[in-house]
Structure formats: C-alpha cells, structure tokens
UniProtKB/Swiss-Prot annotation:
<protein>
    <recommendedName>
        <fullName>Malate dehydrogenase, mitochondrial</fullName>
        <ecNumber>1.1.1.37</ecNumber>
    </recommendedName>
</protein>
<feature type="binding site">
    <location>
        <begin position="41"/>
        <end position="47"/>
    </location>
    <ligand>
        <name>NAD(+)</name>
    </ligand>
</feature>
<feature type="binding site">
    <location>
        <position position="120"/>
    </location>
    <ligand>
        <name>substrate</name>
    </ligand>
</feature>
<feature type="binding site">
    <location>
        <position position="152"/>
    </location>
    <ligand>
        <name>substrate</name>
    </ligand>
</feature>
<feature type="active site" description="Proton acceptor">
    <location>
        <position position="210"/>
    </location>
</feature>
<dbReference type="GO" id="GO:0006108">
    <property type="term" value="P:malate metabolic process"/>
</dbReference>
<feature type="binding site">
    <location>
        <position position="186"/>
    </location>
    <ligand>
        <name>substrate</name>
    </ligand>
</feature>
<keyword id="KW-0809">Transit peptide</keyword>
<feature type="binding site">
    <location>
        <begin position="150"/>
        <end position="152"/>
    </location>
    <ligand>
        <name>NAD(+)</name>
    </ligand>
</feature>
<keyword id="KW-0520">NAD</keyword>
<dbReference type="InterPro" id="IPR036291">
    <property type="entry name" value="NAD(P)-bd_dom_sf"/>
</dbReference>
<comment type="similarity">
    <text>Belongs to the LDH/MDH superfamily. MDH type 1 family.</text>
</comment>
<dbReference type="InterPro" id="IPR001557">
    <property type="entry name" value="L-lactate/malate_DH"/>
</dbReference>
<keyword id="KW-0496">Mitochondrion</keyword>
<dbReference type="Pfam" id="PF02866">
    <property type="entry name" value="Ldh_1_C"/>
</dbReference>
<dbReference type="GO" id="GO:0030060">
    <property type="term" value="F:L-malate dehydrogenase (NAD+) activity"/>
</dbReference>
<dbReference type="InterPro" id="IPR001252">
    <property type="entry name" value="Malate_DH_AS"/>
</dbReference>
Amino acid sequence: MKASILRSVRSAVSRSSSSNRLLSRSFATESVPERKVAVLGAAGGIGQPLALLMKLNPLVSKLALYDIAGTPGVAADVGHVNTRSEVTGYVGEEQLGKALEGSDVVIIPAGVPRKPGMTRDDLFNINAGIVKSLCTAIAKYCPNALINMISNPVNSTVPIAAEVFKKAGTYDEKKLFGVTTLDVVRAKTFYAGKANVPVAEVNVPVIGGHAGITILPLFSQATPRANLSDDTIVALTKRTQDGGTEVVEAKAGKGSATLSMAYAGALFADACLKGLNGVPDVVECSFVQSTVTELPFFASKVKLGKNGVESVLDLGPLSDFEKEGLEKLKPELKASIEKGIQFANAN
C-alpha cells in the first residue's frame, strides 16, 4: 500500500477516468465503516498536502479541516476531488468543537514550522501552547478519538497532550500517538539507496524519539539484509537524524519538510484507520506511552487495533552501535518529556 500511493497519483494524472483504480491502489478497500478524520492546522504547509492525501483515502467518509484562517478555501479546493469523503472547512476557535465532534482520528500538524538554525525545541514555546489549547478541546468534543500528534517537538507535545487529557479525565494511553513515521520513511529511503535494493521492499524500525540523536534507526534489523560497512551505517544513522535539517537548509529559509511529512502523516493515519476497522497485523513505529525502557514515552513498533494501541512490541536485538545510541538518547529524550509535562502542569 505505502509504495503505491504516489504511483497511483501519477496513474490518475495520465488516465483521468482511473479514480477508482487510484483509490484501490492507494489505500485499502472500498467497503468500509464510516470514519471521520479531523486535521487541525489544515491550511498550513503540512496541513494542505495532508488534507489532499486524506481525501484520497477511501477509509475516510468525513474530512474536517480546521485552522485559524484559510480553511474554507482549502476545503473548497480539496472538496472538488472526486473521492468518497465529504469535506468541511472550519475556521476560528468558535468552530473547533464542530470540527472535532464525532471524529475517529484527529491529526495535529498545527504550529509554526522550522526555519534555518532552529531545532525542534526552538519551536517549543509557541507550539506547546497551541497543542495544549487544541487538546483541551479534543478532551471535550471527541475524547475517544485516536490522536496523531505531528506538531513539534513531538518529544514534548505528546507528554503535554497526555497531561491535558489526564486533567480532563479522558486520558487513554492507547489512543495517543506521536507520529514518527517520517523518520521511518527517511531511513527506508536512505537505506535502499546504499543497499541498492527496491525501496518498496525495505523495512527499517526507528526507535527513541523524534528529534536529533533521539532518532535511532535500527539498521541491524533492516530488511532486505545488506552487508553495509560500519561507517556506512553510522552515516545513514546521522543522515536519518538530520533529515529535517537537510530539507530546511535546502529550502533556504522558505520552508521545512512539509511534503514528506504530509506523506508520512497520511501513512500513519491510514494505519490507524485500518486498525480501527479490524485489519489484522497492522504494525507501525510511533512515540507512545511505553514500558520498553525506563522512560514514560518511547518510539518503537506498535501493533494497532480497534482501540488504538493493541501492544507495544519489544525492541528486538540491537547492535553494539545501536545499544550505545540508545543510552546516548535517553537523557535528552527524558529532558524533553519532562519539559512537556512541566509546561502542561505550570500553565
């Protein structure tokens, strides 16, 4: 499914009558339950392409697009795409409740983007407040929805969301996800290039967090297997960790990793929808409440089901390099988690 999304879009461009083929190849099956997805921050750099990709997903029957401005235009534009879902735009805080009501999945790409020289933590003061406000509304209007957190720094915004939901009495650790899928997408792409294997066949788990050294791709577990040198593995790991910076610098101050993030967000949302619909053996990496390490939140492989997280999978065997990386990331990840918790409880 994952590798076929972009092929399907290209197919649709060349054959205007192929919309049904597009859908069947892009995302899953057509005979599915009614599912509402809300995108909060839908007029932004990630939100707009993400809205389009969710419109292409036949598992979605209602698509609610929310932002503080600009969503009526985005909704009108995306709404003309001839696919199953009904699209509605909502603008301003007074319409947030309507956007959220009845949602099965809420995707949150809201917030300010990275700029040259900025780290994800530089975004904290602005995005933390945005996330807290949105999660307060989620707790009120759709407390049972699966939450897909994209807003950075994810290592802190997921703990913020958890604290908001705890205070509201609605917290369910099985329903809160930090979307780290872009790290997996990058790791697969970079590995395929070095291993000279088809990227569609590649699988690479990525654990830890979603910023800098907290991102730890497990290339020792990558498939198909390839005999890569230690230096190559180190370089691949570094490039995966710095992937966001690579895009920010390439765009020369005019954007961040919006398109690839939208793609990754759409992949993870699709996995959540499949899990909700009872599709078996849906496994993705995500930053969730976890006991696989001593840290309260951690990214690893997660099995998705009808209630969200069905199980958090073990890390599996690690190479010596990965064991070292795991120990190095823990202090930074712990500090980011605590920063989010402190923000939520102090404001």
